[in-house]
From Swiss-Prot:
Gene from which the chain derives: rplA
InterPro entries in alphabetical order: Ribosom_uL1_bac-type, Ribosomal_uL1, Ribosomal_uL1-like, Ribosomal_uL1/biogenesis, Ribosomal_uL1_3-a/b-sand, Ribosomal_uL1_CS
Pfam families: Ribosomal_L1
The protein's assembly and partners: Part of the 50S ribosomal subunit.
Record function comment: Binds directly to 23S rRNA. The L1 stalk is quite mobile in the ribosome, and is involved in E site tRNA release.
Highest taxon, organism lineage: Bacteria
One annotated GO biological process: regulation of translation
UniProtKB keywords: Repressor, Ribonucleoprotein, Ribosomal protein, RNA-binding, rRNA-binding, Translation regulation, tRNA-binding
Protein family according to the UniProt entry: Belongs to the universal ribosomal protein uL1 family.
GO cellular component terms listed in the entry, alphabetical order: large ribosomal subunit
Name of the protein in question: Large ribosomal subunit protein uL1
GO molecular function terms attached to this record: rRNA binding; structural constituent of ribosome; tRNA binding
PROSITE patterns: RIBOSOMAL_L1 (PS01199)
Length: 229
């Protein structure tokens, strides 16, 4: 693994490696030691006591953050007829049918989220090999396969983030930007924690949140006490 740069090392020195911080302390510290030359993203990482290999311990969904993410999401909606008109009225960036299947197959990715009505999933399904590895495939669990395209587009534009447990049992989620007020970041952090607590699989045994940390785009991780949320 490549050695981190001097700015990273300087930031790391400001973190007490033996301390577990409260959510408020961790967010304040992450903001303070961030050294990016742009408005970096603040991210939280949960290490959960689940076995993702088991179907009954999969965790996936989406949550609307009360203070948004600080990023404007570009939304592509696969819909036709009245649903296409609804998507356009809701502020979708792109709305269409098979023409977008062709564009994506040719390497076009000027969007962040795809929403599709159920009747369009036959078309979207053709893109499985392209969209799947990028995490862009619409899914009913995240509210992106739906007839209510207005609600879906509005929520994404308002600051909806998707979460999914990875093979190691980790869930990562962006909770805003370094420029956000610390209190707003903490409120978003608590919202993500609350939804993950509600999503705890019945089959999960032992400690649910094993480790928790806050970081910025290039910054080091800061350990957080789950009880502080």
């Amino acid at each position: 693994m490549a050695k981190k740069g001097k700015k990273y090392q300087d930031a790391l020195k400001q973190i007490d490696a033996n301390k577990v911080y409260t959510a408020e302390e961790a967010v304040e510290l992450a903001k303070k030691i961030d050294f990016a030359k742009f408005d970096a993203t603040v991210e939280v990482a949960f290490r959960l006591g689940v076995d993702p290999k088991k179907a009954d311990q999969q965790i996936r969904g989406a949550v609307v953050l009360p203070n948004g993410t600080g990023k404007t999401q570009r939304v592509l909606v696969f819909a036709k007829g009245e649903k296409a008109k609804e998507a356009e009225a809701a502020g979708a960036d792109y709305v269409g049918e098979s023409e977008f299947v062709e564009k994506i197959n040719q390497g076009w990715f000027d969007f962040d989220v795809i929403v599709a009505t159920p009747d369009m999933m036959g078309e979207v399904g053709k893109l499985g090999r392209v969209l799947g590895p990028k995490g862009l495939m619409p899914n009913p669990k995240t509210g992106t396969v739906t007839m209510d395209v207005t609600k879906a587009v509005n929520e994404i534009k308002a600051g909806k983030v998707e979460y999914r447990v990875d093979k190691a049992g980790n869930v990562h989620a962006a909770i805003g930007k370094v420029s956000f007020d610390a209190a707003k970041l903490v409120e978003n952090f608590r919202t993500v924690n609350d939804v993950l607590q509600k999503a705890k699989p019945a089959a999960a045994k032992g400690t649910y949140v094993k480790n928790l940390s806050v970081t910025t785009t290039f910054g080091p991780g800061i350990k957080v006490d789950p009880a502080s949320l």
